[in-house]
A protein has these predicted regions:
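Helix-rich, typically C-terminal accessory recognition domains appended to large enzymatic cores
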Residues: 382-418, 428-530, 661
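N-terminal, positively charged nucleic-acid-binding surface of large information/translation enzymes
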Residues: 1-201
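Structured secondary-structure scaffolds
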Residues: 1-46, 98-102, 145, 168-408, ...
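Beta-strand segments within the central parallel beta-sheet cores of soluble alpha/beta enzyme folds
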Residues: 325-328, 509-511, 621
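Phosphate-backbone binding interfaces of nucleic-acid-interacting proteins
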Residues: 569-703
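A short small-residue
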Residues: 9, 53-59, 85-86, 373-382, ...
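Intrinsic disorder at enzyme termini
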Residues: 508-596
Length: 703
């Protein structure tokens, strides 16, 4: 028996769970249930990520304390996870005494071992709010062209990049106050000290997916940099210990204490139920015991950097064991596109649960998930077809076709022998490959193998035709024999599907009158065995309920402009929106419906390269990262041409975060194929590329 600790990434405590989040938690839960079914001791912990400026500001906006804010969100998260049958052994919060203890312990050990440094950093400071301003919280006039209301890192009009301290007439977007320049000591984790260790660690077989390890190599090639791990008050988080009296209000950056939350949640479980469960913290986290236990992190591919570089380096530097493996997954698209509020495909967990069975989604995700970091697509038509065909039409149908004959004619008792032992043995033997697929996180393969077994059962029933035999006098024993074989196969299918469909399989367990659905139980044949009354195990997916879910997920777009204008208002109260003309047009513009607007997919893109096009004075050629990956998880770039060469030098745009229309049909041009369109704003013949905050990830959509 293996001893395994499993975690999922910690959801941030400032908003609800949606289907994109659930890919990870359902994937992890299925793996945990499968490994438990295979006889291993598996512990699954998680927590809310509950610190940071965003939470502090969200609480202030809601008129509550940060503690109340995170408590309310945690309760909502736990309800959503329970609704989708995600069975944590412990769900905690990073705002806990255990997390504070281990965050400070790790920091102190890193400090003592020479891995912490500090230096003065100058930043703009809001004297009214009493906090330092990140670039997204300060605006002013461009130091080059004088354009007003530009963010603290680049000008949307002329494309110049600069430091926030270079803005003319800056103001805080939080208060409207004029910021002052203020120096502050920042603390850094010296990540380059662990470069050799990390290169070896990330290349160990089985530690990371190959595509992830290859991506991390780019960071090693560029050279690791010291990591800023401190924030100044006011900040919602933990204070950094042992700072000088002159620097009393230094806090850990949220990404330092967030992964420590894995340890803290497990420690909380050990303290509360360790004796009962046979769990000891040091067995899983001390270096001395790392060969006797295993630790697995399930995460999204967008946070690999923190988990595969910072986190193992922190643990190594502080004398703790490092994870056995980190399993990254891709993103979720819906109907082949990024999730969209306007299209009703940005679906919250609660909205789904109000309309549909959670096990539908668990099965559909399982049928799509593999060990790769490739994105998965929730096609709602395919979703309905697959669930109805596989689960209702194939699996449940076996029991519903046979149970009546056993109850009505044989006193609910199965035959004393198995008339087709070779067929049943094939299904039992298939369990070896199914178990291996589960362990390797190749869930889609496991589902295919299970459905192949279901097909064999239905082919057997169709061949024997028990409904016809039942009408022939003297053939009732044969009917009992056929149904006994079919229901034994059904039992195997239930064993195999239990990690994915725990509720349905529990109903099936009661119907079959068996004690266990663990993998080993499949070897015990049901002969001379009494079954219970059959009740419906799963209903077909109702198309109207899917439509109702989508409709309920569509936000009232009439409210969006007011919200956008409010968010972009400066100290004068005037709207600062740049994407549209500053004055209302006097000409008439044809109106379009929301369905027309919803057809356009606007995707956040990172400019990886930008070049002049020889022979085309007006064109620039862009290489964009729009968040797409190939089957191996490598970035799949897009080539886009844009007629803005007269307004920009190529080097001005490299590294920018722009908006690309990604669902335009590819256009063949003289100089190559253009695979999208970069958005620009136009006034008086001047084109300005629309740029976004660099913190927004490639692949996010405007909705």
């Amino acid at each position: 028996m293996r001893k395994i600790l499993v975690t999922s990434a910690l959801p941030y405590a400032n908003g609800p769970i949606h289907l994109g989040h659930l890919v990870e938690y359902i994937q992890t839960d299925i793996w945990v249930r499968a490994m438990k079914s295979l006889g291993h001791q598996v512990t699954y912990v998680c927590a809310d990520d509950a610190h940071g400026t965003a939470i502090m500001l969200k609480a202030e906006a809601n008129g509550v304390t940060p503690e109340q804010q995170i408590a309310d969100v945690k309760a909502s998260h736990e309800k959503d996870f329970a609704g989708f049958l995600v069975d944590f052994d412990n769900y905690y919060s990073t705002h806990s005494p255990e997390n504070e203890h281990y965050s400070q312990l790790i920091y102190n050990r890193l400090y003592e071992n020479g891995h912490i440094s500090h230096k003065a950093v100058e930043q703009l400071y809001d004297p009214e709010k009493g906090l330092f301003l990140a670039d997204r919280f300060v605006k002013g006039e461009c130091p080059k062209c004088g354009a007003k209301d530009q963010y603290g890192d680049n000008c949307e009009v002329c494309g110049t990049t600069y430091n926030a301290t270079e803005l003319k007439n800056p103001y805080s977007t939080l208060s409207g106050a004029t910021p002052v320049l203020k120096s502050s000591i920042h603390y850094f984790f010296n990540l380059p000290n662990f470069s050799e260790f990390l290169q070896n660690w990330t290349r160990k077989e089985g530690r990371l997916q190959t595509s992830i390890a290859n991506k991390l190599q780019e960071w090693f090639d560029a050279g690791l940099a010291n990591w800023d791990i401190s924030r100044d008050a006011p900040y919602f988080g933990f204070k950094i210990p042992n700072t000088p009296a002159s620097e009393p209000d230094k806090y850990f950056y949220v990404w330092l204490d967030a992964p420590v939350g894995y340890m803290a949640s497990f420690k909380n479980l050990c303290d509360q139920q360790g004796a009962q469960l046979g769990l000891h913290f040091d067995d899983y986290w001390s270096k001395e015991n790392h060969n006797n236990t295993e630790v697995y992190h399930f995460i999204g591919k967008d946070i690999v950097y923190f988990h595969a570089l910072f986190w193992p380096a922190m643990l190594e530097g502080a004398g703790f064991r490092t994870p056995t493996a980190i399993n990254a997954h891709g993103f979720l698209t819906v109907n082949g596109e990024k999730m969209s509020k306007s299209r009703g495909t940005f679906i919250k967990a609660d909205t789904y649960l109000q309309n549909l069975d959670p096990e539908y989604l668990r099965y559909y995700f399982a049928s799509k998930l593999s060990a790769s970091v490739e994105d998965i697509n929730l096609d709602l038509e395919d979703f309905m077809q697959k669930v109805n065909s596989d689960l209702v039409g194939k699996v449940v149908n076996i029991a519903s076709r046979c149970a009546g004959f056993i109850h009505k004619n044989h006193g609910s008792k199965l035959a004393l022998t198995i008339s087709e032992p070779a067929l049943l043995q094939q299904i039992i033997d298939a369990g070896e490959d199914i178990a291996a697929a589960y362990e390797a996180r190749e869930f889609s393969k496991a589902m295919r193998l299970i459905m192949a077994c279901a097909d064999k059962a239905n082919e057997y029933i169709d061949d024997k035709k028990p409904w016809a035999l039942n009408k022939v006098e003297g053939q009732q024993a044969e009917v009992q024999a056929v149904c006994t074989v079919a229901l034994n196969i059904f039992r195997q299918l239930v064993v195999y599907l239990a990690p994915v469909l725990p509720l349905m399989c529990e109903k099936a367990r009661i119907f079959l009158n068996v004690d266990s659905l663990d993998f080993d139980s499949r070897h015990a044949l049901l002969v001379g065995h009494t079954i219970n009354a059959f009740t419906p195990l799963m209903q077909r997916v109702d198309k109207d309920k899917v439509a109702a879910m989508v409709d309920a997920s569509k936000e009232d777009l009439n409210k969006q402009p007011a919200i956008a204008n409010q968010a972009a208002t400066g100290p004068s109260g005037a709207s600062k929106t740049k994407a549209a003309a500053s004055e209302q047009s006097t000409g008439e513009t044809a109106l379009i419906g929301i369905d027309d607007f919803a057809k356009v997919t606007m995707t956040v893109a990172k400019v990886l390269a930008c070049n002049n096009v020889e022979g085309a004075d007006k064109l620039l050629q862009f290489t964009l990262d729009v968040g797409e990956t190939d089957a191996q998880g490598n970035v799949k770039t897009r080539n886009v041409f844009s007629g803005i060469a007269k307004f920009y030098n190529p080097e001005q745009l490299v590294g920018k975060t722009v908006v690309c229309v990604t669902n335009l049909a590819p256009r063949k041009m003289k100089f190559g194929i253009s695979e999208g369109m970069i958005l620009s704003a136009e006034k008086a013949g001047q084109l300005t590329v629309v740029t976004l905050d660099d913190h927004i990830p490639a692949g996010a959509t405007l909705a």
